[in-house]
Amino acid sequence: KDLIYAMMLESFNDCAVVIAEQVAGTTEHFSKMMNDYAKKIGCADTFFITPNGLDAQKDSQFHHTTAEDLAQIMRYCIKESPKADQFLKITGEAEYTFTDVSGKYAYHCYNHNAFLKMMDGAISGKTGFTGNAGYCYVGALEQNGKTYIVALLACGWPNNKTYKWSDTRKLMEYGL
């Protein structure tokens, strides 16, 4: 549970690797599982190599997705997954604190998803960044009984970190 919060709120990539190795034995096998599941939920143009989304190449293929597939993954996570309620709880938390096994040291995670406070009805989202992809974001909002999802890829590079927030707001307002 602590690893999931640290991964989703703080984007601690090492947590994704630990989870992948625990679930599947290796990150390679976990990536295969992710690719199989992505296809199962309708993603047509996604190929995962790393469990944390970092840039990678395997043979002639690169770790990649599309905005459409990323939105599809978010839709699954918040609407169709048997764990949707847990996903929404985790990604909607402003902060989370846990301790080491001895209880001596506390660790604090803070949610970097500024969109949660930007618009009424914002329910979930996840930030991302790599050198190849730039700043990325997928977020969801519910208003008037409808769910809206925005997925942004390559939305600025360093010195333009906040573009994703203004672009998300513009697209959400357009959809409303």
Describe each model-derived feature in a short phrase.
Residues V17, N35, G121:
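Short glycine-/small-residue-rich flexible loop motifs, especially phosphate/cofactor-binding loops
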